[in-house]
């Protein structure tokens, strides 16, 4: 008989979706089958509200080895190697249980990468919280950072960079996005396919418990009263187990016995089995009585929906089972044959002799509902506010100090010093610069990585904000001397059932796609996190873009810090009146308002070409993009460096704009570079049609900024450093 509305509510299914299940099965589903559909048809697993928009993104390119649809994307980097990378969200679990939520987010993205046969080389993160002046937000931040560091450090993968942003909109919905990069030979990439009828299905790794049941469903619902009491749905991670699992999986892959492999992440055994079968067009028979369990009395429903960590499902060639078992026994891990690949296209779940579920794999995956949800074009009244009409701040040195002390701009050393950024000895540029850089062992190459996003811009104008996010992520990679070769995205939004939220999403995806096409950067995969709302209040639309870039000669990698006195500093690109959505307007006037900067993608591409030519030729000593806080903040950051004050300088800013605009405008497509090859740089800039302005030379213990004969700012480096370290002082203070 049909189930009641209370059952559907608990499983986050609509009545229409239930009726669709009945049609697909030709009968009423049993309770276990309802559970399977609940997790597989969740937003988290099915992308049912986003798929129609994501299909428009550019996913192909000459370097793309694996695009969307697998555990991670992959791009060729030469020498028979591929960079494997992906970004994922763990927002909801991190709000409920910050340490474990963040830790298992790192664990999940690591498994996505080594499931492809790649050894993880680096992790980045993108974090967003409410204002750190609130004790609750500081506790969330501390828990998340400890979780990321605790898992990554113990596993032995360096956390090499990321971003931390503080905004009111993330007060009740922090964002925790993690990116992992690994390396693999292009001819040794593994995929999540249950191929070969008769082949054996193995369960490997940790035992199954009741943690994480309905984690995917929880991640597909907004928060309300009592959300913080959902700790049972948050998984518990064991990084030491994961490290052993990594080594065992990579060794098993080398035996040639493995046909396909997928980690048990969201939706656990249900997702891994049904997706592997659907991709291969096969069926899978599973006996959950053979699944290793750490709790007694677990039902088929609980075993199939558990999201216990550090588990994998793999398919081995029939007759090679002993080879697989031998490897995992060597590493003291469970490797239990729990089923076989069949030819009927169905997922059949047994508990001993009893049939608990019998569902077509395609019904759980390919035939999940796809919604073209209604949306309205975003029209934010705050975006039409004329911020240029606001009174100019009279104390420009004070504004610069205030911007450097702003939590989003201030030094994040308190965060990244809790991460091991150099384990495995591949890190060339760690946290604190525009992009992280890791070497590719056995070659002269290196890879640069960056995550970027600007929810403030996207709230004001989703289309333009998304274009700006892509451009800034690519620009940061270029500032490290790397050519962008691939991107991944994590799209964090509110409730897609609200037309205004869906409008934000549609325009964001459109902007992201347009920018990636213009800059020739394919998207190889990503993640969508909807329902980032509490009591109807949504976060800013926040697309986080992860970009990977290639440096042919690792010796040419750049950082953003001034190196030596006497080097000339150039501003590449022109400054315009771009204060909309800026840090200046937020810090000085207390508003998020105005039209975000308008991005010229042609100018952006020309800037990239110039900087890459100059970096590759060895003309540049440093490079830093101008973004939050404008050129004044960028110059201060170059002088401060990653670890403390270096040399300053006296710099004259070009143009006749109002002084506060000259200093703090956030016009895109600009970069600060230092060089001793001035003539060559100027000639190349002319050839690439990029404005090139000499600001001055590095030297002294003060930062002085002028406009013609007018002095705008004159501050000693010690004061700048004190302002820049304000966040560390706040976070290091004794807990209340």
Language-model regions: role of each:
Residues 1-736:
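Glycine/proline-enriched, intrinsically flexible loops and inter-domain linkers
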């Amino acid at each position: 008989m049909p189930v009641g509305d209370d059952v559907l509510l608990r499983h986050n299914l609509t009545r229409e979706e239930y009726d669709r299940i009945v049609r697909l099965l030709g009968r009423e589903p049993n309770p276990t089958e309802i559970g399977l559909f609940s997790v597989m048809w969740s937003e988290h697993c099915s992308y049912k509200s986003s798929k129609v928009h994501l299909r428009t993104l550019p996913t192909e390119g000459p370097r793309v080895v694996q695009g969307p649809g697998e555990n991670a994307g992959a791009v060729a980097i030469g020498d028979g190697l591929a960079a494997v990378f992906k970004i994922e969200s763990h927002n909801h679990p991190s709000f409920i249980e910050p340490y474990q939520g963040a830790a298992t987010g790192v664990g999940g993205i690591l498994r996505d990468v080594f499931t492809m046969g790649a050894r993880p080389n680096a992790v980045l993160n993108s974090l967003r919280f409410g204002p750190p002046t609130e004790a609750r937000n500081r506790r969330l931040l501390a828990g998340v950072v400890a979780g990321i560091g605790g898992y990554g450090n113990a596993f032995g993968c360096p956390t090499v960079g990321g971003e931390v942003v503080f905004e009111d909109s993330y007060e009740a919905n922090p964002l925790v996005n993690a990116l992992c990069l690994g390396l693999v030979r292009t001819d040794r990439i593994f995929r999540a396919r249950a191929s070969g009828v008769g082949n054996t299905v193995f369960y490997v790794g940790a035992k199954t418990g009741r943690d994480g049941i309905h984690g995917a469903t929880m991640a597909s619902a907004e928060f309300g009263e009592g959300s913080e009491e959902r700790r049972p749905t948050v998984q518990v991670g064991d990084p030491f187990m994961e490290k052993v699992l990594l080594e065992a999986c990579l060794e098993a892959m080398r035996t040639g016995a493995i046909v396909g492999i997928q980690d048990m992440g969201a939706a656990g055994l249900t997702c891994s089995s049904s997706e592997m079968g659907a991709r291969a067009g096969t069926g899978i028979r599973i006996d959950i009585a053979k699944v290793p369990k750490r709790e007694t009395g677990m039902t088929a429903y609980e075993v199939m929906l558990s999201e216990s960590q550090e588990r994998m499902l793999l398919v081995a060639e029939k007759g090679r089972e002993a080879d697989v078992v031998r490897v995992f026994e060597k590493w003291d891990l469970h490797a239990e044959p729990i089923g076989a690949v069949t030819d009927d296209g169905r997922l059949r779940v047994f508990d001993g002799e009893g049939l608990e579920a019998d569902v077509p794999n395609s019904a759980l995956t390919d035939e999940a509902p796809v919604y073209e949800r209604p949306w309205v074009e975003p029209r934010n009244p705050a975006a039409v506010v004329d911020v240029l009409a606001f009174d100019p701040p009279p104390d420009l040195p004070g504004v610069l100090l205030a911007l450097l002390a702003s939590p989003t701009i201030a030094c994040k050393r308190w965060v990244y010093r809790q991460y091991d950024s150099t384990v495995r000895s591949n890190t060339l540029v760690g946290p604190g610069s525009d992009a992280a850089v890791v070497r590719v062992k056995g070659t002269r190459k290196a890879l640069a990585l960056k995550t970027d996003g600007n929810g403030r811009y996207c709230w004001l104008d989703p289309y333009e904000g998304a274009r700006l996010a892509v451009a800034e992520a690519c620009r940061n990679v270029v500032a490290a001397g790397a050519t962008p070769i691939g991107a991944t995205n994590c799209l964090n939004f509110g409730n897609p059932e609200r037309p205004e939220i869906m409008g934000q999403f549609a325009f964001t995806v459109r902007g992201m796609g347009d920018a990636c096409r213009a800059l020739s950067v394919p998207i190889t995969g990503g993640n969508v996190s909807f329902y980032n709302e509490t009591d109807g209040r949504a976060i800013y639309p926040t697309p986080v873009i992860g970009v990977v870039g290639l440096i042919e000669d690792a010796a040419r990698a750049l950082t953003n810090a001034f190196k030596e006195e006497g080097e000339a500093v150039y501003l590449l690109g022109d400054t315009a009146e771009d204060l909309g959505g800026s840090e200046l307007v937020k810090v000085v006037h207390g508003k998020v308002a105005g039209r975000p900067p308008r991005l010229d993608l042609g100018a952006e591409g020309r800037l990239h070409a110039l900087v890459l030519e100059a970096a590759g030729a060895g003309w540049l000593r440093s490079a830093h993009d101008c973004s939050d806080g404008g050129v004044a903040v960028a110059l201060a950051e170059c002088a401060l460096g990653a670890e403390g004050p270096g040399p300053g300088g006296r710099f004259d800013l070009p143009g006749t704009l109002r002084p506060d605009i000259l200093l703090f405008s956030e016009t895109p497509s600009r970069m600060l570079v230092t060089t001793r090859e001035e003539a060559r740089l100027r000639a190349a800039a002319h050839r690439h049609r990029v404005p090139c302005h000499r600001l001055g030379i590095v030297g002294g213990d003060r930062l002085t900024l002028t406009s013609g004969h007018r002095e705008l700012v004159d501050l000693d480096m010690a004061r700048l450093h004190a302002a820049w370290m304000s966040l560390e002082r706040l976070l290091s203070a004794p807990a209340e």
